[in-house]
Amino acid sequence: MASKALLLFVMLTFLLVIEMEGRILRVNSKTKDGESNDLLKRLGYNVSELKRIGRELSVQNEVDRFSPGGPDPQHHSYPLSSKPRI
């Protein structure tokens, strides 16, 4: 009888642990954004001004980036006579 009770206790404990680890928490992205805005306001920042500055900087900093032709095939190559010793 004691072994059945112990087995039942272990099974229930195991199921509780699995349930706690498998819980899915849904987080609304608007909530996170609202919390960060509230924090910035409490720290004394003007949130609308920060957003305006961010938009202006993103428009001003549009940079045309390009690759100069890919990797240099000779970068890691070496002549067979000068093979490094390991």
Swiss-Prot record:
Signal peptide: 1-22
Glycosylation sites: 46, 71
InterPro entries: CLAVATA3-CLE (IPR039617)
Gene Ontology annotations of biological process type: cell-cell signaling involved in cell fate commitment
Top-level taxon in the UniProt lineage: Eukaryota
Keywords: Developmental protein, Differentiation, Glycoprotein, Hydroxylation, Secreted, Signal
Region Disordered: start-end pairs: 63-86
PANTHER family, per the entry: CLAVATA3/ESR (CLE)-RELATED PROTEIN 7, CLAVATA3_ESR (CLE)-RELATED PROTEIN 5-RELATED
Full protein name: CLAVATA3/ESR (CLE)-related protein 7
Organism: Arabidopsis thaliana
Lineage of producing organism: Eukaryota, Viridiplantae, Streptophyta, Embryophyta, Tracheophyta
Gene of this entry: CLE7
